[in-house]
Amino acid sequence: MMPSARQVALANVVVDIEKGAARVGWDHAPSIYALVPTALLLSDPNLPADIAEQLRAGWDGSDEHLSAIIQEDLADDDIEQVLAHLAWPETVPGAAITVERIVVPPEVEDEAPEDPEEALAFVANHPLRTDVRLAVGVMRSGESWCALRTRAFDSDDKVGQGSNLVPALVDALRASLEPVTDEEA
């Protein structure tokens, strides 16, 4: 099955976000982005000329093409809490995030101490640890895309991609796009 134009646009912007994070380097706090149709941005008469020129340079001319607008850098230790309380206006059709994490094989996780601080130190200093950068994007219409880069294979041609590589992060980001009810407001 061929991916939809929206899925392709989402994949392209997520890969662009990840490449941008790679240019900055490792050991950075998470960043969150609003994903907005480029055509919508270009239709704004108040858009500064230099920004419009940059957008046009990367725009493929389609209505589905997305631009990422960075919102803020997030503290590394509260990402789940921030996503749980984040709400996007209805005018934002998608969102993305970049975050770095340490992963270890399941058997190493099983060996970790019960105490959360001790477990973090154990994993962070374990010889089988792997540093990864995740870029995840979701759309209100349901599409998702993930890009994963490891520090050990830090090259654009070694970035893993897929629609649901990090299900928990996809779900958390998708929840931030859900409409806020009167009870939650």
Give, region by region, the residue ranges found by the protein language model.
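Glycine-rich, aromatic-bearing surface loops/beta-hairpins
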Residues: 106-185
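Intrinsically disordered, low-complexity linkers and terminal tails enriched in Pro/Gly
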Residues: 1-3, 50-59, 110-119
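A contiguous, surface-oriented mixed alpha/beta subdomain in the mid-to-C-terminal portion of proteins
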Residues: 31, 52-53, 92-95, 176-185
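N-terminal interaction modules that seed assembly of large macromolecular complexes
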Residues: 18-72
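Short loop/turn segments at secondary-structure transitions that flank enzyme active sites
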Residues: 40-42, 103, 142
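Internal, well-folded beta-alpha domain core
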Residues: 63-131, 140
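Short N-terminal edge-element motif at the start of the domain
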Residues: 1-19, 23-26
